[in-house]
Structure formats: C-alpha cells, structure tokens
UniProtKB/Swiss-Prot annotation:
Species per Swiss-Prot/TrEMBL record: Gluconobacter oxydans (strain 621H)
SMART domains the UniProt entry points to: PQQ (SM00564)
Name of the protein this chain belongs to: Alcohol dehydrogenase (quinone), dehydrogenase subunit
Active site: residue positions: 342
Modified residues (Pyrrolidone carboxylic acid): 35
Residues that coordinate or bind pyrroloquinoline quinone: 95, 147, 277, 369, 588
Length: 757
C-alpha cells in the first residue's frame, strides 16, 4: 500500500476484495451524516454551532478544546458514572483525541488502528487495521501512538506510523484512498527515519500531515493532499536543502534566501537532515486564512555538531505561518534559536481573541517545551509578550521587543563543552498533552511538568548509528545510575526532588498563574474545558478527574485502572452529554525513563476508551495490578562485557526498555524476560528479530553478535543487582510495588514557580 509514492492507491472492487482482511466491516452507521460543508461546521463550532459534536482535533479551528455543553457542571459532576467502556486490542500508549460526528465516535489507537463506535453505547460499528509492519516501531522515538484523525465531508483521515495517509468512508470504514507521504526523491538525510503519529488537519479541502523522526535523522516537512483524491497539492520543508538547492516545493524561495544562511556551512545537519519535524501541531485559522506549523528540534540535538555552533538554524523551534492555498511562507516566529535542548515548538498552537493594551487582538497563545508562555499576533507573527509558565534555568527572560531569549551562558552546553543540568529537560515544561481554554474563566489550562536532564556531548565527536537515536549526547549520562554508590544515591534524591507534575491555570491577560493543581508526578493527560465550569483531566496514576475551572477544587475522581495521557472530549448522543477519554500508559517518559516513571504512580496497561454520563450504569472488569514480576535471574555474567554492554544498551535499547534496563511498565522488563538467560535465545530475539511482528525489530545490521552478547551480560548484571529491591518493594498485601523507586522516596515538594524549582 506504500507503492506509487505520491500517486494515491486507486480503489477497485478487486483491490477491496484482496484487502478484505485489513479493511473495515460490519453494520451500517445508525445515524445520518450532516450534509453541511465540514469547514463551515468546524468554523461555527467556535460560535456555538454543533455543540454536541467534536469535529476536529481541538474541536474547532481555534483548538481551544472548549465545549459549550453544560448538562454536566460543577453542581452535578460529582454524580458522574461510567456509561460504557470499549477494550482496545493493544495494551500500549493511547494518545488519541476521538472525533464525534452525529453520534459516531472515531477513535485512532496504537499501531494506527481506527475504531468507529456508537457514541451512546460504545458498540463497535466498524474497525480498520492498516497493518503497520512491526519492524517500523524502532523508527519512532516515543511509542507507536496515534494522536487522532480528521473528518471532512463524509470521510475520516488518519496517518499511519509507517508514513501513510489514509482516507476512509466514514459510514462503512472502507478505503477511499491511501498515499505514502515520504518522498523518495527528496533530500531527507541519510537515516530517513520517518513516522507519522500526529493528527492530520484539514484546511479548505486539503489534508495536512507532518511527521517525526529527528531523534534518528530526518528533515522536516508538511504535505497537503487533496481531501477528495489524495493528490499532492503542495509541500513545505522546514529546514533548508543541504546543498541550498530547490526541492520543487512551496518552501524553496524562503529556505534558500532566509533559512540557509542561518545554518553552518558544514556540520552533521547535512548528513542527518537537520530536523525540524512537525510531529504534532498543525492549525488552520479561518480568521487570518493562514496555516500555522509548530516546528520541532534539530537533528542531531547537539548544536555544535549539527551546525558548527553557528546560526539560529531556521526554522527549528519556530511557529511558521503559510498560505493554505499555495503552501507559501508568510511569517515565522522562532521561540528557541540555536536549539540544543530539544525544545520543540510542536506543542499545541491555540488562537483566541483577547485584550492587549486595551485593544482586542486575535492572537496565538503557545506553551512550548522551553517553559515560556508566548502571545503573538496571529496575522503578523509579531511578538507581544512572553513569561515563564514554570521554572526554567536556560534563559534570563525574553527580549521585550523581539521575544528572543536572553541565554544563561552555562546553558549553551555545546559551546562551553561542559555538562549542564537543564530544567526543563528534553521532555519540556509542556509536551504533547493538550491544553484547554475557557472563554468563561478566560484561563488557559496547561498540563505542566518538570523533568530535568543532564546534557553532555557525545565523546569523540558525532557518530551516527543505524536503528538508534543520534542526538550527539553522551547516552551514558542521559539517565540515572542505579547502584548503591553514595554519590549516585544522592543524585537520585536530587533528581526526584525536582521531578513534578501539575496543572497550571494561566491567566493570559495577567501573564501569571491563577491557581495550580498538584499531581503525583509528571506525564499527565491533556485537558478539556466546558461551559459547565468544569475541566477534565486524566492522570499518570490512573485516575480521571473533574476540577472546578474557577479554582481547581477536585470535584470528581474515577479509578481508570491505567494511566491516562490522552485528552478528554465531550459530546451529546440522544440528547445526553458524555465525557470520554482514551486510556493507556505510554510515550517516551515510561519508555526511556523507565523506573523513574513509576513515581507518577504504579500502573499496568488496560488500554480502552471510557465514557461517562450522569446516569451511567457500567463498571470496569477486575484489573491486573501486578505487571512485570521479578524472576530470579541467572547468577553469572562477564564483568568486562557488561561494562561495554551498558553503552550499547543505552544507545540501542534504553529508548524503549528504559534507562538502566528498568521498564516503565509499557514494554517488557528485560531483567525478568526469559531471553537474556541464554546467549542463543537472546541473539534470536535481538539479532534475528524473532518478535519483529510484535514491534521488536532485528539489530544484526546495527550490532555485531559480540555487541549483542555484551548487552545480554549487562541486563543479567542489572537483574542480579536489582532483584532483591524489586522483591522487597512487593512485600505487602497487594503484591503491587510500593511507592518508591529503588528505595528513594519521591519528593512531595510544592510545584515550581518561575523563580524556584
């Protein structure tokens, strides 16, 4: 289905029959779809139109995630009950925003699957599996997630992790067209490690889709396809062609004239692609008739390796506005020039109307990874103001005229050549979890967090590895040492002391927090605001909450059995208001940070969609709380080999199976797996890809058999030195690990402020 590149697959009767196993089936949708133009309907959503639907990723083009529904409100939300649940077929991370159109819910799930459900009952109407190959999993940094779909005139559109964009008939689930979005002929870097996990957006009949991959090696771009035919309309690259040549794209003129001079004439960007992937936020604004792109980090992260430590590297860490008809550049605002911290600008872009110096302005409000809350003019891109929404130690504020950061000298770690502990770290003060805005309270609700990172350069200069992250960082220092060395124990305590998660209700007029809601740890779900003066949010500890939007008081809590990182939606079906959310623990925090992620709350995945109403009568089945249980490891390993294996593990394995071989609860904990117990069994798994179909790719082209054996010895060593602690943590009446990370208690300190961590 990926052949033909930009030529959409032509759907014939024969092709449909031959693909029957992968196509959707079952009964017709029991509702009538509206005949109104979808663009008009989405536009009206900001003005009270279609209150019972959720037609676009952020509900409306403004992406405020605000619903005018108020059947559920502060007076009765405490009476919410589970109305229905639908168990998913993949117990991995779920980040999707379901769409609801005339009583039908369209939910994208892990491995890029699409489910159409009756929004009133949760009954499956049809299902579509694009059959993403398992070996594609290691091309992505952060789980095989999908953040959502788009709806347009009777069709639903979604991206697949292997780079396709698919259009389905919304009523039947049958394939209309499919196109591969990654052009073979383009200069995209040597790695070409592209994935699609973001939700497409539709602007004036064009389906917009970006991609990810900068951790491995990629050159960012956004493509626009005709919603009816799947034909490519235009493409915009976000960083220059390495030879400063035209790509035959809408971005040619601006990249060659303005962006290319901001990059070093040499550097790893010319081989790695430079980065700048648009993996999440794409927004069409009908008020300005512009499309806003949130542009990501550099590839590699290391600024000195990437660009010789020269130039601002446009358009990394920027919001770029382009013409939706032509894809041509209109303006840009760079939030993080010279990015060397993975401070992406792909976080949710939101538009709203608000007073600025006594005048109503149409603005973009943005809370990217770097910790600053920005307000910029939506028409011109002119900086209006910016303040930290959390503690940050990389900049001494922003220039009041230009918005350029005033760098802390030590934060420029690639130029000083010295390690630097950054707050925020690479996961940002705010990541993909969606924020929301209420026009009633005039507050923006941000799922904020604080996860530091020690930045230090790759030893011996930049070296790229196939099938691995290529950041230009010392991967041995990206996590926490896990032993009884007093210095390492002290370092863990210091780390956990500043590890936090909270929701900040930000007043964009005062540029200050109105209130905050403390959570157990970071990596919590997105927000929903409603006219009932309620905000809804799922948490990493497995709870689903409703808070008073005016003061943050906790009004309702439901044990969802698994962590929630997705944002909720609300809608009506048969005249009744529901609130729904996807459940499932995943993403890069539990993948890479492993055991540290346990401090947000122990959770075992039971991935599903859950929906609430005031008269719900459903209940969840019993849950498995134990997760991966310790198994007595083989007692012997080679000390010299395990030392070499530590570097190889951190380079090739930690991004999925956790720092220092401690799983964060999504993928198998290799310490307790049977594979490392023998050399041959481990090589079959890692070298020959015995579990490729399940997402564990083969690495015999990336590592030698001896290097794979080194990794096995390291895992056995880690199993032996952590087994007793893991068993001890489960010595209680439930058998569930207690609230500790290797006997280092989590801090209960207050959330950080702008001037204190």
């Amino acid at each position: 289905m990926t052949s033909g590149l930009l030529t959409p697959i032509k759907v014939t009767k024969k092709r449909l029959l031959s693909c029957a196993a992968a196509l959707a089936f079952s009964a017709a949708v029991p509702v009538a779809f509206a005949q109104e133009d979808t663009g008009t309907a989405i536009t009206s959503s900001d003005n009270g139109g279609h209150p019972g639907d959720w037609l676009s990723y952020g509900r409306s083009y403004s992406e405020q995630r605000y619903s005018p529904l108020d059947q559920i409100n502060t007076e009765n939300v405490g009476k919410l009950k589970l109305a229905w649940h639908y168990d998913l077929d993949t117990n991995r991370g779920q980040e999707g925003t379901p769409l609801i159109v005339n009583g039908v819910m369209y939910a994208t799930t892990n491995w890029s699957k699409m489910k159409a459900l009756d929004a009133a009952t949760g009954k499956l109407l049809w299902s579509y599996d694009p059959k993403v190959p398992g070996n594609i999993a290691d091309r992505g940094c952060c789980d095989t997630v999908s953040r959502g779909a788009a709806y347009w005139n009777g069709k639903v559109y979604f991206g697949t992790f292997d780079g396709r964009l698919i259009a389905l008939d919304a009523k039947t689930g049958k394939l209309v067209w499919s196109v591969y979005t990654i052009p073979k002929e383009a200069q995209l870097g040597h790695q070409r490690s592209y994935t699609v996990d973001g939700a497409p957006r539709i602007a004036k009949g064009k389906v917009l889709i970006g991609n990810g991959g900068a951790e491995f090696g990629a050159r960012g771009f956004v493509s626009a396809f005709d919603a009816e035919t799947g034909k490519l309309d235009w493409r915009f690259f976000t960083v220059p062609n390495p030879e400063n040549k035209p790509d035959g794209a809408a971005s040619d003129d601006i990249l060659m004239s303005k962006a290319y001079p901001t990059w070093g004439k040499n550097g790893a960007w010319k081989q790695q692609g430079g980065g700048g992937t648009v993996w999440d936020s794409l927004v069409y604004d009908p008020v300005t008739d512009l499309v806003y792109l949130g542009v990501g980090n550099g590839s590699p992260w290391n600024y000195k390796f990437r660009s010789e430590g020269k130039g601002d590297n446009l358009f990394l860490g920027s919001i770029v506005a382009i013409n939706p008809d032509t894809g041509k550049y209109v303006w840009h605002f760079q939030e993080t020039p010279m990015d060397e911290w993975d401070y992406t600008s792909v976080q949710q872009i939101m538009t709203l109307d608000m007073p600025v110096n006594g005048e109503m302005r149409h603005v973009i409000v943005h809370a990217p990874k770097n910790g600053f809350f920005y307000i910029i003019d939506a028409k011109t891109g002119k900086f209006i103001t910016g303040k930290p929404y959390t503690y940050e130690n990389w900049a001494n504020g922003l220039d009041p005229v230009t918005g350029r950061p005033n760098y802390v000298p030590d934060a420029l770690w690639t130029l000083t050549g010295k390690p630097w502990l950054g707050i925020p770290g690479e996961l940002g003060g705010h990541n993909f979890a969606a924020m929301a805005y209420s026009p009633k309270t005039k507050l923006v609700y941000i799922p904020a967090q604080q996860i530091p990172l020690l930045y230090d350069g790759q030893k011996g200069g930049f070296k790229a590895y196939h099938d691995a992250w290529n950041l230009g960082l010392d991967m041995n220092k990206i996590g926490l040492f896990d032993d009884n060395d007093p210095e390492h124990v002290a370092a863990k305590k210091d780390f956990l002391k500043v590890l936090k998660g909270w929701t900040v209700a930000w007043d964009p007029e005062k540029m200050a927090p109105a209130f905050t809601i403390n959570h157990k740890g970071p990596w919590n779900g997105g927000l929903l605001a409603t006219a009932g003066n309620v905000i809804f949010q799922g948490l990493a500890n497995g709870e689903f909450h409703a808070y008073d939007a005016t003061n943050g008081n906790d009004l309702y809590s439901f044990p969802a059995q698994s962590a929630i990182i997705a944002p909720p939606v609300t809608y009506t079906a048969n005249g009744k208001q529901y609130v729904a959310v996807e459940v499932g623990w995943g993403g890069i925090y539990p993948f890479l940070y492993g055991g540290v992620a346990r401090t947000s709350g122990w959770t075992v995945n039971h991935s599903r969609v859950i929906a609430f109403s005031l008269d719900g009568k459903d209940s969840l089945p019993p849950k498995n709380e134990l997760g991966f249980t310790p198994v007595k490891p083989v007692p012997t390993y080679d000390e010299a080999r395990q030392k070499d294996g530590y570097f190889m593990y951190q380079t090739f394995c930690s991004a999925c199976h956790g720092d220092n071989a401690i799983s964060g609860g999504v993928l198998p904990d290799l310490r307790w797996s049977g594979a490392p117990r023998g050399r041959e069994s481990f090589y079959k798994l890692v070298g020959r890809g015995a579990l490729t179909a399940y997402g564990m790719d083969r690495f015999d082209t990336s590592m030698t058999p001896e290097q794979i054996e080194d990794i096995r010895n390291f895992i056995v060593k880690r199993a032996n030195e952590s087994y007793d602690d893991e068993v001890k943590a489960r010595e209680n009446s439930t058998g569930v690990p207690n609230d500790q990370f290797l006997n280092v208690p989590q801090s209960t300190a207050d959330v950080p402020t702008a001037d204190h961590p």
